[in-house]
């Protein structure tokens, strides 16, 4: 007799062997038709999975997040099946699920073309309509390796050979196509209905540039056509908002081959940077931080002491001078510890909050570089808080308040929070980890925040909190972090004199809000589609004349606005006013002031906002009040 407990607490009792599908059918034929898989005692399994002991079971349908992931995983197999039918000599490698879709990597004698992509998608639709049963079987390892070698699938044979001996080798078959996979998968190919192939890209085998270059086909799959169409519309909008396009259109920055992964900031782009940096300086000062500056090039011996040389060496730029070896800093923390160590510290000095707009360099792979979002030279809004264990809870709580206010001021009102706890390999005692994790969780709970636990995902030196923004298109950007560090202060000799006159090692909190200035500006550009809030816009106002008769008045207005700390320029070109308005509107300037003979006579200004919003005529003083209010409110 087997007892299966359902999520509502109901027990289903069977006196014969059953599968997950049998349980679904016992509940009702409707559920059996829509079920995709099951979660058996917390483990995702196929509908064909036998239930041999008393178990807890959750049936997974396409309404569950896991259901959509299973559909996408099965769609990756559908893609590989179609490629093998159309291009039999192609070799299949891996095909995982990614955010919003999936991909599959292939080795083939020639590059796939857009026409190939269309043919593959059409064949996928045909295979879906065949309603092939998808079956799982566990194979003997050597037999599975031989099977794929006989098919000429040498990559699959390599993967199987690398699977640990204690793991089963499971293969999934649909018709005459068989693939290696842990699963689970949908029961029939017909359950994969809504999908689209998106693009072709290059990818190295096992992600190593020393290996063969493969062809990666990306796709997306959804439960309904409506969801897929909404996703495609979001992609289209994201393409319009691409910060690289807008950066060129708005004359903000450029990048070139002579400095890969490094940014040339133009005056307008640098104006945005300066506004962000000045704002951050103000909020840091108000919250008890002191700003410092540390060297960019440090002797390798310091990186060896900190542990970065051992763990981060391949991403560091190295140089040599006078027989000494140096590294350009990839992060700021060792330098901040040196500032803390300079002089005798007392418990009365703690917490000490050291902040730096630290310029860092990391030797990222050229293929990973992406505009402002992934660069080699970047500036972090970095800070390190040195405190006692008893001060951790209060410091974390204060940081959360600061971070939330900063995000709101920049127009982000929703963020996701994850707490990552102790990994298997770690430093520090269990008691230290218990207290540290409890303090971080308590701070999040004290602020009544929703957060997700990520067991085992913390750094080796301490637990961490990650803050992920959601932008106006619903995309997620991990920016803020707070990491508790047991290791580095001890490794670099940091200490303070405690109240009992003994020397103790401080706790070190690594924290950032924006992450990197470059990436955050890229996110801001895309979030606002280039139409930045007034307080951040490089040009807040442009004053336009209709004819030469108004040139002196335009200059007078421009000077008055500058005196009120408003970023303003004038356009006195001998062009039609409609042309000038259109040109500056495309530059996404928040306000255009149009001046003709009537405005000169009445000593007024006619104001146009974005999206052709006509504010009409008003006094210059009235406009100054309007724009300064918007600047103060950061709208």
Swiss-Prot record:
It comes from the Bacteria. PROSITE patterns: AA_TRNA_LIGASE_II, TGS. GO terms for molecular function: ATP binding; metal ion binding; threonine-tRNA ligase activity; tRNA binding. It is found in: Cytoplasm. Its cofactor is Zn(2+). CDD domains: TGS_ThrRS (cd01667), ThrRS_anticodon (cd00860), ThrRS_core (cd00771). SUPFAM superfamilies: Class II aaRS ABD-related (SSF52954), Class II aaRS and biotin synthetases (SSF55681), TGS-like (SSF81271), ThrRS/AlaRS common domain (SSF55186). Residues 1-61 form the TGS domain. GO terms for cellular component: cytoplasm. Signal peptide: none annotated. Its EC number is 6.1.1.3. Zn(2+) binds at residues 333, 384, 510. It holds the Pfam family tRNA-synt_2b. It catalyses: tRNA(Thr) + L-threonine + ATP = L-threonyl-tRNA(Thr) + AMP + diphosphate + H(+). Binds 1 zinc ion per subunit. Catalyzes the attachment of threonine to tRNA(Thr) in a two-step reaction: L-threonine is first activated by ATP to form Thr-AMP and then transferred to the acceptor end of tRNA(Thr). Also edits incorrectly charged L-seryl-tRNA(Thr). This is Threonine--tRNA ligase. It comes from Nitrosomonas eutropha (strain DSM 101675 / C91 / Nm57). The gene is thrS.
């Amino acid at each position: 007799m087997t007892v299966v407990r359902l999520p509502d607490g109901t027990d289903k009792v069977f006196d014969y062997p059953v599968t997950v599908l049998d349980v679904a059918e016992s509940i009702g034929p409707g559920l059996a038709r829509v079920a995709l898989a099951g979660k058996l005692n917390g483990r995702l399994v196929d509908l064909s999975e036998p239930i041999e002991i008393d178990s807890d079971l959750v049936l997974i349908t396409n309404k569950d997040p896991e259901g959509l992931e299973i559909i996408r995983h099965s769609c990756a197999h559908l893609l590989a099946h179609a490629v093998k039918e159309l291009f039999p000599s192609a070799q299949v490698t891996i095909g995982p699920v990614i955010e919003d879709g999936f991909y599959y990597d292939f080795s083939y004698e020639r590059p796939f073309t857009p026409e190939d992509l269309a043919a593959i998608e059409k064949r996928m639709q045909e295979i879906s309509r065949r309603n092939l049963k998808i079956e799982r079987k566990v194979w003997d390892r050597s037999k599975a390796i031989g099977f794929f070698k006989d098919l000429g699938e040498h990559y699959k044979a390599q993967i199987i050979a690398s699977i640990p001996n204690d793991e089963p080798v499971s293969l999934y078959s649909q018709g005459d196509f068989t693939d290696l996979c842990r699963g689970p998968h949908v029961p029939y190919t017909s359950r994969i209905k809504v999908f689209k192939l998106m693009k072709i890209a290059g990818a190295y085998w096992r992600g190593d540039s020393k290996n063969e270059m493969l062809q990666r086909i990306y796709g997306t799959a959804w439960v309904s056509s409506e969801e897929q169409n909404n996703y495609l519309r979001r992609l289209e909008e994201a393409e319009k908002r691409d910060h690289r396009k807008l950066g060129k259109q708005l004359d903000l920055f450029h990048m070139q081959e002579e400095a890969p992964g490094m940014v040339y900031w133009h005056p307008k782009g640098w104006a945005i940077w300066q506004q962000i940096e000045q704002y951050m300086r103000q909020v840091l000062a108000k919250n008890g931080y002191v700003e410092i500056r540390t060297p960019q090039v440090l002797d390798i011996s310091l990186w060896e002491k900190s542990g970065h040389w051992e763990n981060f060496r391949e991403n560091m730029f190295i140089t040599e001078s006078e027989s000494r070896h140096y590294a350009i800093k990839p992060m700021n923390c060792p330098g901040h510890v040196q500032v803390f160590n300079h002089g005798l510290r007392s418990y009365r000095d703690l917490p000490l909050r050291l902040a730096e707009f630290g310029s860092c360099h990391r030797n990222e792979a050229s293929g990973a570089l992406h505009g402002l979002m992934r660069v080699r030279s970047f500036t972090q809004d970095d800070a390190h808080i040195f405190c006692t264990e008893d001060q951790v809870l209060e410091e974390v709580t204060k940081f959360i308040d600061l971070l939330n206010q900063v995000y709101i001021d920049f127009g982000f009102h929703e963020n996701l929070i994850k707490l990552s706890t102790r990994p298997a390999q770690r430093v520090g005692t269990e008691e230290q980890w218990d207290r540290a994790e409890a303090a971080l969780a308590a701070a999040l709970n004290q602020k009544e925040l929703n957060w997700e636990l990520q067991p085992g995902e913390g750094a080796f030196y301490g637990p961490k909190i990650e803050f992920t923004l959601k932008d106006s298109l619903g995309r997620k950007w991990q920016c803020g972090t707070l990491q508790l560090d047991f290791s580095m202060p001890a490794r670099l000799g940091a200490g303070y004199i405690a109240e009992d006159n003994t020397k103790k090692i401080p706790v070190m909190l690594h924290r950032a809000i924006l992450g990197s200035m470059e990436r955050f500006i890229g996110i801001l550009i895309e979030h606002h589609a280039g139409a930045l809030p007034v307080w951040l816009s490089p040009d807040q106002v442009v004053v336009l004349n209709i004819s030469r008769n108004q040139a002196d008045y335009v200059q007078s207005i421009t000077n008055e606005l500058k005196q009120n700390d408003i970023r303003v320029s004038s356009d006195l070109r001998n062009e039609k006013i409609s042309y000038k308005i259109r040109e500056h509107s495309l530059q996404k300037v928040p306000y255009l002031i149009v001046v003709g003979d009537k405005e000169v006579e009445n000593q007024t200004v006619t104001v146009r906002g974005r999206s052709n919003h006509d504010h009409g005529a008003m006094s210059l003083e009235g406009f100054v009040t309007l724009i300064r209010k918007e600047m103060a409110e950061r709208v």
